[in-house]
Every structure is written in C-alpha cells, then in structure tokens.
C-alpha cells in the first residue's frame, strides 16, 4: 500500500454497500449507487466539471469505469435528450462510475429524473464516498487499472472471488469493442443541433451526403454534420468499402469508439485503406483517427493513463493556435511511425502525443480529440467545417468560413 492508495473517505459513516477491487488486490469501500451486481472493467479518471450524462453514455467508454475528479455530482439530474449513445435501449457506454460525494437532488429545468435512478435504468454500477483524489493519483502513477466494481445493498462481498476476477480480466488491449456498440443496420440521421428555443430540429433540405462508419459514434457528432447541411447515412462498423461506395457519398466519416484500434482494425483498416484511395473526402475522430493511421502504415500504442476530460490543451500546427478540447482515449498514434506523406497536424501540450494528421495531396484528415465537445469547449468546431469544405471544393463550390462569424 503506497501513500496514494485510496481509503474510505473519513466523513463517510454508512455501512459499505459497494467496493472497487483493483487487480493488485487493493480494495476500496464506499456507498453503492445505481445498478447492483459486479463487472470487470478498466478504471480511468475524467477531469470534466460538467456533462456526466454525456460522458457515461459515450460508447467510447465501453469496458471502463469512470472516476469523476470533480466532487459534486447529480446537480442537473438526467434526461433522455443528453444521451450520446446512438441506440439508448442497448445502454452502450461506461459500465461503472465513481464519485467523491453522494448524489445531490437535481435542480435544472431539463431534468427528467435524478442521477441515481438514471444509473439504475442504464445498468451502471456506481460507488460514492471515497477519496477520488487519491484514486486519481494512483491511476496517474500506476496507469489505468483493471478492476471489478460491485454493489450489494446488503454489503455482502466475496472479496477473494472479486480479487481473482480483477486479476484475471484481460484488459482493453486486443479487445474489439466496436462490434458490441455499433448499430445493427444502416440508418439515416436527420436530427439537428439543440437550441434553447426549438430543442432538436429535423433536417429537411441536405446539400451533401456523408456516410458515417459507426464504431461507437456520439449523437452530437452526427448533429453537427447535419447542422452543416449533410445528410448522414450511418453504417455498421463491419461495412466494407463497397458498402460505403454503394451509397455514392460526397464524404466519409470514421467515428469514435471503444477498445483497441488494432483489434477493430482487423476488419476496418482494409476498408479505410480502400476509401483513402478513392479521393473522396474523409474525416476521422478518436478511434477513427487511430485506425486511419493504421491504414496509412502507422502504429498505435496503449497509453499509461489515457486522456479523459474537457480541458486538454492541443496545438493545431496548421494555424499555430492552441485549443482547449475534449478528449477520451486510452490508445494513441505513434507519430514517429507515420510515413512521409502523412503530416502531424495536432499535438497534445500535456504530453506531446499525436492528436491529428492529414494526408499530403489527398482530402483526408483526422483528429484524436472530440471536436463536437459535448461536454466541453467548442474551440474545435471548425474541423467539421474543414471537412465540409473539402466536399465543397470537390464540387467546385466556394469554402465556408472555418469559424462562425460573430453576429
């Protein structure tokens, strides 16, 4: 046990009803919330102050337990509109959550239910009342941890069995989780970005056609594409290049998603490689970025602790500007492995890891971070306009301003 080993928070006096058991045998006790049961997953931490519902329903968090570093939780409740999972009935996203404080009563006009009830409905096991700073420090020092999170209202746990489950879990390396979170069949997405006056509108006159390969896509990504005039046809992760081209797209989008890019890439990389050669504009985010790098001849690697939060500084070499972005990934592209015809366009100012690339002479680019920013900043919304401008250029149309003009 090191100095950073988390212990039950000193102000917690309730009987333990949940435990987090790490692969090294460390046991952390607290109050159980949400669903009951036990599940193996990787423990990470997220530094965002807001947007817990969007975080927990992001399919990229499949196979993970999210530790929230901000102490307050539940303030705005939960609702059906803020879910990021494309198919909410399947409940793709994080399997567990860890909080410092107990859930507070919601105080927001959009709240439909409290967070505890929502966690139960989503099947997410939660643990509260622990020293999340100490757990975060442990992850920072030792790396993302394989673990089991368990919740029993009676507080009955077979710790030896839970320790064995945590120690024997395979982890995220070599796991293809995209096949678990992707849609079962194609669909056309028409929903527009949310506004205070109208909520979510519906697109009626698209100007372009984008095919999105769904490796775990977030709804807000699709909304931003429709908001720029694109009809979006979403295809399953296993779609072939021939499947994509049969829709006669003006552009192709490679979505975010969970798991190891090398594992999903077993079937996705050949498809991406063929699409790159067509000359059709192509844009990738997160897992899509990583698999594009693999298709171009690069390599990916597992990160020590990953990047998870809405306050990450990234430098855009194409403009010289620094952006504050939202990130959620545990694997990264090895920039030294990229071939000469591929330029690094973005880099993390936290650790220097690759955050973007483009192919010289082709309308192909991608980023590691999440420019749709839900939750998070909007510094990177221009990337969607950059993608649409590649489509417009191919059609002989004038480009849009990359950043919206102030009213």
Swiss-Prot record:
Protein keywords: Amino-acid biosynthesis, Arginine biosynthesis, ATP-binding, Glutamine amidotransferase, Ligase, Nucleotide-binding, Pyrimidine biosynthesis
Q: Which SMART domains match?
A: CPSase_sm_chain
User: Which is a Pfam family this sequence falls into?
Assistant: GATase
> What CDD domains does the entry give?
GATase1_CPSase
Q: Which GO terms describe its molecular function?
A: ATP binding; carbamoyl-phosphate synthase (glutamine-hydrolyzing) activity; glutaminase activity
Entry's transmembrane regions: none
Quote the InterPro entries the UniProt record gives.
Anth_synth/Amidotransfase, CarbamoylP_synth_ssu, CarbamoylP_synth_ssu_N, CarbP_synth_ssu_N_sf, Class_I_gatase-like, CPSase_GATase1, GATASE
Q: In the UniProt record, does the keyword Kinase occur?
A: no
Q: What are the EC numbers?
A: 6.3.5.5
Which reaction(s) does the protein catalyse, per the Swiss-Prot or TrEMBL entry?
A: hydrogencarbonate + L-glutamine + 2 ATP + H2O = carbamoyl phosphate + L-glutamate + 2 ADP + phosphate + 2 H(+)
Looking at the record, the residues that make up the Glutamine amidotransferase type-1 domain are: 209-397
Can you tell me which residues bind L-glutamine? Answer: 60, 257, 259, 287, 290, 328, 330-331
Chain segments carrying region CPSase = 1-205
Active site (record annotation): 286, 370, 372
The record's family statement is: Belongs to the CarA family.
Q: What NCBIfam families does its record include?
A: CPSaseIIsmall, PRK12838.1
Its annotated function is as follows: Small subunit of the glutamine-dependent carbamoyl phosphate synthetase (CPSase). CPSase catalyzes the formation of carbamoyl phosphate from the ammonia moiety of glutamine, carbonate, and phosphate donated by ATP, constituting the first step of 2 biosynthetic pathways, one leading to arginine and/or urea and the other to pyrimidine nucleotides. The small subunit (glutamine amidotransferase) binds and cleaves glutamine to supply the large subunit with the substrate ammonia.
Please identify the protein, giving its name as recorded: Carbamoyl phosphate synthase small chain
């Amino acid at each position: 046990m090191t100095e950073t080993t988390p212990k039950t928070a000193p102000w917690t006096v309730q009987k333990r009803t949940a435990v987090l058991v790490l692969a090294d045998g460390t046991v952390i006790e607290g109050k159980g919330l949400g669903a009951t049961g036990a599940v193996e997953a990787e423990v990470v931490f997220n530094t965002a102050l807001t947007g817990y519902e969007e975080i927990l329903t992001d399919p990229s968090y499949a196979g993970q337990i999210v530790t929230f570093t901000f102490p307050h939780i539940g303030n705005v409740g939960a609702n059906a509109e803020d879910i990021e999972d494309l198919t909410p009935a399947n409940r793709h996203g994080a399997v567990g959550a860890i909080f410092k404080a107990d859930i507070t009563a919601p105080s927001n006009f959009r709240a439909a239910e409290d967070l505890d009830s929502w966690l139960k409905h989503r099947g997410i096991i939660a643990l509260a009342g622990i020293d999340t700073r100490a757990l975060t420090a442990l992850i920072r020092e030792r790396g993302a941890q394989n673990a089991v999170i368990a919740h029993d209202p009676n507080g009955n746990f077979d710790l030896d069995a839970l320790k064995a489950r945590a120690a024997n879990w395979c982890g995220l390396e070599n796991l293809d989780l995209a096949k678990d979170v992707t849609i079962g069949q194609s669909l056309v997405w028409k929903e527009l970005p949310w506004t205070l006056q109208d909520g979510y509108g519906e697109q009626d006159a698209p100007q372009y056609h984008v095919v999105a390969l769904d490796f775990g896509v977030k709804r807000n990504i699709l909304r931003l594409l429709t908001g720029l005039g694109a009809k979006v046809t979403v295809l399953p992760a296993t779609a072939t290049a021939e499947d994509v081209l049969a829709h006669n797209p003006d552009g192709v989008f490679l979505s975010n998603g969970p798991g190891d890019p090398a594992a999903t890439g077993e079937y996705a990389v050949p498809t991406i490689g063929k699409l790159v050669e067509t000359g059709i504009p192509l844009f990738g985010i997160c897992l899509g970025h990583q698999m594009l790098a693999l298709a171009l001849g690069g390599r990916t690697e597992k990160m020590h602790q990953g990047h998870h939060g809405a306050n990450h500084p990234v430098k855009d070499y194409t403009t010289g500007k620094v952006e504050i972005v939202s990130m959620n990934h545990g694997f990264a592209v090895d920039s030294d492995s990229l071939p000469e015809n591929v330029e690094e366009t973005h880099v993390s100012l936290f650790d220097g890891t690759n955050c973007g690339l483009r192919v010289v002479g082709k309308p192909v680019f991608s980023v590691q971070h999440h420019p749709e920013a839900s939750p998070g900043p909007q510094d990177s919304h221009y990337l969607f306009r950059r993608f649409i401008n590649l489509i417009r250029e191919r059609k002989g149309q004038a480009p849009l301003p990359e950043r919206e003009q102030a009213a």
